[in-house]
Design a protein with these regions (language model features):
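Sec-dependent N-terminal signal peptides
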Residues: 4-13
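N-terminal soluble segments of membrane proteins
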Residues: 2-3, 17
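Surface-exposed, low-hydrophobicity beta-strand/loop segments enriched in small/polar/acidic residues
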Residues: 18-172
Length: 172
């Protein structure tokens, strides 16, 4: 039995180095604080770490309806009919490659990020990008219709860290 346990410990270290990208916070009207300017805003925060050897981030699904922590009644949200308003990208202590790409797509493959987060991720400073296909006075924002898939690509730094804040607004 000791040999089996020892073999498992020796042969599985690569599994510990797998990249992660998880919902780490949801700010909605149920836990309103200084992050939420009004009742029609939901902020979903993803904390992502690249693989320790392959420097890749896993794609992550943001459910259309959910809560944080998952399965609780806390911080409940329903993004149906909301628009993706802004995306904040903050590099962590282990900085990613400059000009990394973030994509946000729905179940039908529509790019809710409108290509605005392509090859322009900063490795050193936080960025807040408005997601609109036109300018004032008539900006057009992509509407959330299904669960979202978030992917980070074009990174070549092992264990790079990125925090994403997806800001959704209710359509008025």
């Amino acid at each position: 039995m000791k040999k089996l346990i020892l073999a498992l410990l020796i042969l599985t270290p690569t599994a510990w180095a797998v990249g992660t990208c998880n919902v780490s916070n949801v700010t909605s009207t149920q836990n309103a604080n200084n992050r939420v300017p009004d009742a029609g805003v939901v902020i979903v925060t993803l904390t992502c770490t690249a693989d320790a050897s392959a420097h890749t981030f896993p794609a992550t699904t943001v459910p259309l309806v959910g809560s944080y922590p998952s399965g609780t009644l806390l911080n409940a949200y329903n993004l149906t009919g909301y628009v993706l308003y802004q995306v904040g990208r903050t590099p962590g202590t282990t900085q990613p490659t400059a000009n990394y790409t973030t994509t946000i797509t729905d179940a039908q493959g529509f790019a809710l990020d409108l290509g605005l987060l392509t090859t322009n991720g900063s490795a050193t400073s936080a960025q807040l990008t408005g997601i609109s296909s036109a300018t004032a006075p008539y900006p057009v924002y992509p509407t959330v219709r299904s669960a979202l898939t978030v992917a980070i690509t074009a990174n070549s730094v092992n264990s790079a860290q990125i925090t994403l804040d997806l800001v959704f607004r209710a359509v008025v």
